């Protein structure tokens, strides 16, 4: 208990009995939290930083998901199905959501074609949306959840846990102005409020100077302060 995986390297002398090591490793894999963003479809559609072909990347994504199922990795997301990059490339809120959900269902169909159980891989899927100041962003999360849960239940027969859509919000980089950058914190605060009132699972607030440079320590502290003040002082 309490021994991290990083301490369990192979040496000339056995540190722990093999069965104890195997149990610690299995427990760690079942509890560890994190996200693999590797969404190849948003790369093709928006970000364009593809290293591998779409077909090969999909196969790798499927391999990761199969490993997660085999090793009972239940709390780590195998993919972050990303609309943020699509929005940054110019999509409005409605188009962002449409492309992102379509990509999500593409992954579902592909994993099913490889013989995976939807109730085993459904909980490993997560989403990533942008929030701008357009009014549709006030409801993007709840609309996404309603569409996703209905399709997962009625089309694919998923259980309640696999029907749940978990999503991260990052405030819109595209909305930041290069002139009078100090006012960007106001834009980011409004976007953060949209996200919180729409019940996002996690939130990233952009630094006000990202329109012109790599964020500084001061601007990042201000971006973090937006979240902290909303969380601790609002309401």
Segments from the language model and where they lie:
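Catalytic alpha/beta active-site cores
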Residues: 1-131, 136-137, 155-158, 162-168, ...
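Short glycine/threonine-rich loop-to-helix capping motif typified by GTGT followed
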Residues: 89-98, 132-143, 171-185, 213-222
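K/E-rich alpha-helical interaction surfaces of small helical-bundle regulatory domains
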Residues: 142-154
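Conserved, mostly hydrophobic/aromatic
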Residues: 148, 198, 226
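Short, acidic/polar
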Residues: 185-192
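Active-site or pore-adjacent capping/gating segments
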Residues: 190, 201-235
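Histidine kinase transmitter module recognition
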Residues: 195-196, 229
């Amino acid at each position: 208990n309490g021994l991290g995986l990083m301490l369990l390297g192979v040496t000339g002398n056995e540190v722990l009995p093999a069965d104890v090591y195997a149990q610690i490793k299995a427990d760690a894999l079942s509890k560890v939290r994190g996200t693999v963003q590797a969404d190849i479809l948003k790369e093709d559609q928006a970000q364009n930083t593809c290293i591998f072909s779409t077909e090969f990347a999909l196969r790798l994504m499927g391999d990761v998901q199969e490993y997660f199922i085999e090793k009972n990795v239940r709390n780590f997301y195998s993919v972050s199905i990303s609309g943020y990059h699509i929005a940054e490339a110019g999509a409005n809120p409605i188009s962002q959501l449409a492309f992102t959900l379509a990509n999500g269902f593409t992954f579902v169909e592909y994993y099913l074609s490889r013989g995976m159980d939807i109730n085993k891989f459904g909980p490993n899927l997560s989403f990533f949306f942008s929030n701008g100041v357009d009014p549709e962003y006030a409801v993007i999360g709840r609309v996404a959840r309603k569409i996703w849960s209905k399709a997962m239940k009625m089309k694919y027969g998923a259980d309640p846990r696999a029907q749940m859509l978990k999503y991260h919000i990052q405030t819109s980089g595209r909305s930041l102005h290069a002139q009078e950058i100090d006012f960007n914190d106001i834009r980011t605060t409004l976007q953060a409020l949209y996200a919180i009132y729409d019940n996002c699972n996690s939130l990233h607030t952009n630094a006000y100077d990202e329109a012109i440079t790599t964020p500084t320590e001061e601007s990042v502290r201000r971006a973090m302060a937006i979240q902290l003040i909303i969380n601790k002082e609002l309401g």
